[in-house]
């Protein structure tokens, strides 16, 4: 579409689409994008900074404004800490929502004055002022007359189409596989080069919380190599500080522990994984 409008691409990088898209559509660009993203474009002609975050908030985006009127932003809060103008103050108001919902539920983070750009929002920043708008929202008012079977078929088709779109890659692709329904379904649709699983041993030596056997069986059935590791309690306890460092804010979801080790395992073999 952009090429048809006369835009000439000089690279094969997908991010170049954002630059040409902004040239053509301005702040309407975010609503036209599909995928997971968080980006900023600085328009030197208008002195406007334009940014957006994907509709589900898959990609993080943090920002704050210093007393000097500077806008700091990044995909991690820790990337802002070294700036001399960053406000190093705890946001006590974030504690109650966190204890209630077990995650950082406010747009303002645990750092006073540092915010998350909400999912499905774009912003323009000029002359020290932030203007923000939502560009997408789900509509639950629509009632469907489809049968259960038709709904299931529609969902299956949508999932497979989405997985296929994400499957496009110039390098090997891996998949996290817990042995549960959702990861097994995605793995079967994706057919990655490798799968990755971690499990826990219980104090009595059992495998109550371990699904690596099911993950290995599915991988074998699909003809895919499965890399798996068993985690000890010592490994998990020793990693808590590092895990919290990477999370930036308090995180009560216990799945962040196996996910940390799962990412380490996968990174030794692939760079793109689901």
Language-model-detected regions and their locations in the chain:
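Catalytic subdomain that performs nucleotidyl-dependent activation
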Residues: 251-258
């Amino acid at each position: 579409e952009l090429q048809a409008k006369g835009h000439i691409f000089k690279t094969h990088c997908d991010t170049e689409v954002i630059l040409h898209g902004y040239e053509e559509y301005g702040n309407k660009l975010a609503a036209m994008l599909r995928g997971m993203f968080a980006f900023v474009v600085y328009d030197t002609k208008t002195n406007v900074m334009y940014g957006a975050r994907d509709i589900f908030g898959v990609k993080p985006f943090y920002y704050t404004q210093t007393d000097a009127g500077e806008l700091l932003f990044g995909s991690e809060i820790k990337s802002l800490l070294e700036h001399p103008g960053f406000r190093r103050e705890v946001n006590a108001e974030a504690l109650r929502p966190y204890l209630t919902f077990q995650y950082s539920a406010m747009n303002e983070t645990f750092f006073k004055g540092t915010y998350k750009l909400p999912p499905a929002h774009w912003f323009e920043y000029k002359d020290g002022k932030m203007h923000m708008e939502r560009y997408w929202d789900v509509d639950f008012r629509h009632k469907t007359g489809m049968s259960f079977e038709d709904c299931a078929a529609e969902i299956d088709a949508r999932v497979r189409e989405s997985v296929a779109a994400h499957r496009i890659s110039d390098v090997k692709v891996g998949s996290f596989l817990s042995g549960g329904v959702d990861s097994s379904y995605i793995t079967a649709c994706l057919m990655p080069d490798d799968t990755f699983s971690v499990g826990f041993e219980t104090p009595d030596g059992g495998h109550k919380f371990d699904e690596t056997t099911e993950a290995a069986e599915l991988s074998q059935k699909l003809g895919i190599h499965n890399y798996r590791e068993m985690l000890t309690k010592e490994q998990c306890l020793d990693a808590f500080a590092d895990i919290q460092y990477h999370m930036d804010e308090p995180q009560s979801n216990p799945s962040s522990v196996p996910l940390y080790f799962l990412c380490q395992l996968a990174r030794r073999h692939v760079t793109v994984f689901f």
